[in-house]
């Protein structure tokens, strides 16, 4: 074989998958870069990560369903908003009471120290939540679902103001800027209602009435920080039982306000018993306010009700009302359970991101006709602008909060969450990461006093004295 043949042989043999000695050569095909992405994702998905993703997806899904069902319940009880407010308050009392009784008598989940916690603090929290729920339900009847979601975000700047006044809380420029943008988004979202061109049955008076709910809601958030400061771990079912009980009691005393409210919330003092009776009939699916016709013709009388969303007197639509209210209360409990699960397993940062994502998804669902029916709220230019502005503000506020939380964590802080279902329709405020200072027990203070007198007390006794309980909060 000539030299030229030898030089050509490797090339020819490689084409035939053979080397110089006749052995077979395996040619490795190049692998596309994107083919390994699914495997990389699978390898990075630990059991804990999958669990967190499931909790987040279920939280967002249940949150969207919860908001939609709340508006559907309001539409069913348009003429009986106060009855609905009390129904949602008293309806949770036996549920939370049964779970609390079981945990007290058959488990050790609720220790004596928790049961000794002053109930007056629950009463104050319940009173504030009752006022919030009153504004939410009464005003929500004539406030469209998308606008409700946007107005709810105003609780963030109002909570910041209340925290600054009562807790001397300080906020970063990023948080303040985000709050101002949120306010701008709320104002933008109210413009269509003020100009009279809004859809979904929005009425300016009731829109502002609904917006007022963020004031007692913000005060409730701040009081939870003050009243439960010394509580290391409050059982959520025990807290909700007392909160719903006092919320129901104080809610009854708000009835006189309806005497001076315009329709459809007007209920005179002498009409309270017939009103509650008709509300109960509506719950059972019986319509009391129905169209009246002129001498059997198809023409309505001047005082007849209509089914138009912007009507002064709206006809009852109580069909299957009891089914809708049961679904709402069930989903509401499930939704709040997932809030706690996301906070526990994923943390406040993931919860904040999921909560922000839930806002546009909910408003999209409100615009789908086959879900909302006649209560559908199509997007308008200003409603989209308000949504985008609020999302930008929420993003800025969340980023500022995350930075603040990281600084608090570096300084030894910890996320302290006061779980609360709160009134219907009002979102929980995002937990703030702050340093938790455990209060000193009486025995610890006594040993400390002896130490100042020159009496030597071993360090172990300090620790033992302070680990007994959280003291009389």
Curated annotation (Swiss-Prot):
Q: Which Pfam families match?
A: CRT-like
Localization: Vacuole membrane
Share an example GO biological-process annotation for this protein. Answer: amino acid transport
Keywords, sorted A to Z: Amino-acid transport, Glycoprotein, Membrane, Transmembrane, Transmembrane helix, Transport, Vacuole
Membrane topology, from the record = Multi-pass membrane protein
User: By its UniProt entry, which InterPro entries does this protein fall under?
Assistant: CRT-like, Transprt_Chloroquine
An example molecular function term from Gene Ontology annotations: xenobiotic transmembrane transporter activity
Q: Which residues lie on this side of the membrane: Vacuolar?
A: 71-80, 143-146, 197-207, 270-322, 374
Question: Record's superkingdom?
Answer: Eukaryota
Q: Which residues cross the membrane?
A: 50-70, 81-101, 122-142, 147-167, 176-196, 208-228, 249-269, 323-343, 353-373, 375-395
A single cellular component GO annotation: vacuolar membrane
Asked if the record carries the keyword Iron-sulfur, the reply is no
Attached carbohydrates are found at: 295
**Topology, Cytoplasmic side:** 1-49, 102-121, 168-175, 229-248, 344-352, 396-473
Family per record: Belongs to the CRT-like transporter family.
Which PANTHER family does the record associate with it?
PROTEIN CLT2, CHLOROPLASTIC
Q: What does this protein do?
A: Nutrient transporter. Involved in maintaining the osmotic homeostasis of the digestive vacuole.
Can you say what this protein is called? Crt homolog 1
Q: What organism, scientifically named, is this protein from? A: Dictyostelium discoideum (Social amoeba)
Identify the coding gene.
crtp1
């Amino acid at each position: 074989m000539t030299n030229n043949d030898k030089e050509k042989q490797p090339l020819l043999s490689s084409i035939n998958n053979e080397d110089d000695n006749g052995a077979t050569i395996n040619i490795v095909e190049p692998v596309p870069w994107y083919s390994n992405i699914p495997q990389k994702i699978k390898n990075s998905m630990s059991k804990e990560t999958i669990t967190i993703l499931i909790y987040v997806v279920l939280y967002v899904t249940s949150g969207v369903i919860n908001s939609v069902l709340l508006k559907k319940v309001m539409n069913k009880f348009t003429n009986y908003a106060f009855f609905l407010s009390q129904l949602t308050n008293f309806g949770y009392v036996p549920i939370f009471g049964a779970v609390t009784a079981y945990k007290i008598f058959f488990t050790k989940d609720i220790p004596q120290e928790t049961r000794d916690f002053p109930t007056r603090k629950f009463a104050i929290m319940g009173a504030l939540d009752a006022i919030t729920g009153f504004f939410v339900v009464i005003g929500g009847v004539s406030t469209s679902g998308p606008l409700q979601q946007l107005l709810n975000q105003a609780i963030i700047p109002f909570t910041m103001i209340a925290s600054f006044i009562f807790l001397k809380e300080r906020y970063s420029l990023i948080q303040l800027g985000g709050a101002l943008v949120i306010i701008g988004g709320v104002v933008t979202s109210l413009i269509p209602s003020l100009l009279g061109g809004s859809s979904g049955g929005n009425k300016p008076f009731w829109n502002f009435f609904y917006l007022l709910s963020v004031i007692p809601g913000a005060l409730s958030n701040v009081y939870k920080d003050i009243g439960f400061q010394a509580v290391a771990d409050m059982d959520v079912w025990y807290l909700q039982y007392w909160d719903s009980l006092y919320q129901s009691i104080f809610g009854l005393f708000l009835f006189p306000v309806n005497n001076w409210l315009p329709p459809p919330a007007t209920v005179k003092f002498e009409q309270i018993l017939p009103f509650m009776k008709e509300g109960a009939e509506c719950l059972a699916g019986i319509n009391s306010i129905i169209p009246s016709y002129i001498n059997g013709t198809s023409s309505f009388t001047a005082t007849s009700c209509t089914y138009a969303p912007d009507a002064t007197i709206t006809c009852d639509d109580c069909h299957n009302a009891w089914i809708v209210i049961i679904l709402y209360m069930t989903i509401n409990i499930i939704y709040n359970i997932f809030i706690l699960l996301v906070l526990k397993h994923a943390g406040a940062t993931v919860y904040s991101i999921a909560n922000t994502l839930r806002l546009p998804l909910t408003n999209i669902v409100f615009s789908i006709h086959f879900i909302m029916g006649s209560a559908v709220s199509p997007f308008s230019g200003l409603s989209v602008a308000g949504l985008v502005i609020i999302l930008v503000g929420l993003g800025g506020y969340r980023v500022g909060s995350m930075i603040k939380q990281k600084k608090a964590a570096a300084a030894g802080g910890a996320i302290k969450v006061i779980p609360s279902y709160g009134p219907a329709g009002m979102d929980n405020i995002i937990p703030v990461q702050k340093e938790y200072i455990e209060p000193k027990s009486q025995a610890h203070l006594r040993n400390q006093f002896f130490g100042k007198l020159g009496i030597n007390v071993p360090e172990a006794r300090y620790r033992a004295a302070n680990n007994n309980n959280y003291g009389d909060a």
